[in-house]
A protein has these predicted regions:
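C-terminal functional regions of eukaryotic proteins
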Residues: 13, 106, 133, 138-152
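Flexible, Gly/Pro-enriched loop and linker segments at secondary-structure and domain junctions
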Residues: 77-119
Length: 154
C-alpha cells in the first residue's frame, strides 16, 4: 500500500486504491511513445490489455501524451516502468524531475536479464518518495516481485 501514496495538487496525502503503469515503449523509426496500462488484479487480463495497448501505438501520437494527461489532472495514480533491455546494471540512479516538475510517483527501471550461476537474473531499480516508502517496504516489494516472476516463469 505504501507505493500507492501520493501528494495531491493541494498538498494533501492520498492513497490510491489501485495504480496504473506508464511505460515508454520503443517505436521503430522514432524514439519512444509512453503508454498507460490500467491495473488488473488478474495477470492474464492485465497482460492481454498491455499487449493490445503496446501493439496499437498511433503513428502520429504525442510521445509525451500520457505524462501530459497526468500533469493536467494533477493526480499521479501511476508508477513508471522503463526498460533498458541492452543494459545489465548493478546500480542505476534515475533522472530526477526538473524544478517545478517534481517526481510524483515511483520510477522503476528493468535492465537486461542475464544468466548467473544457472539462474536468470534481471536488475531492477526503483526511486520512491521516502516520506511514504522506506527500506522495509522496498525489501518487501522486491520479495513480491521475485515471487511473481518465479510463478509466471514456472
Amino acid at each position: 500500500k505504501e507505493f500507492r501514496y501520493r501528494t495531491d495538487s493541494r498538498g494533501n496525502v492520498i492513497r490510491h486504491v489501485t495504480v496504473d503503469v506508464i511505460s515508454p515503449i520503443a517505436v521503430p523509426g522514432r524514439t519512444f511513445y509512453t503508454v498507460r496500462i490500467p491495473y488488473h488484479a488478474d495477470f492474464e487480463r492485465f497482460y492481454a490489455e498491455a499487449r493490445a495497448i503496446v501493439t496499437d501505438i498511433p503513428q502520429d501520437g504525442d510521445p509525451y501524451g500520457a505524462e501530459k494527461v497526468l500533469q493536467a489532472q494533477g493526480d499521479y495514480d501511476v508508477f513508471l516502468l522503463s526498460a533498458t533491455p541492452d543494459l545489465y546494471f548493478t546500480s542505476l540512479t534515475y533522472a530526477q524531475g526538473a524544478p517545478g516538475q517534481p517526481t510524483e510517483y515511483p520510477l522503476m527501471n528493468a535492465g537486461k536479464a542475464v544468466m548467473r550461476e544457472g539462474r536468470l537474473v534481471m536488475p531492477l531499480s526503483i526511486f520512491v518518495n521516502h516520506a511514504f516508502v522506506d527500506g522495509a517496504h522496498i525489501s518487501r516489494f522486491f520479495k513480491l516481485v521475485e515471487e511473481c516472476l518465479k510463478r509466471i516463469s514456472a
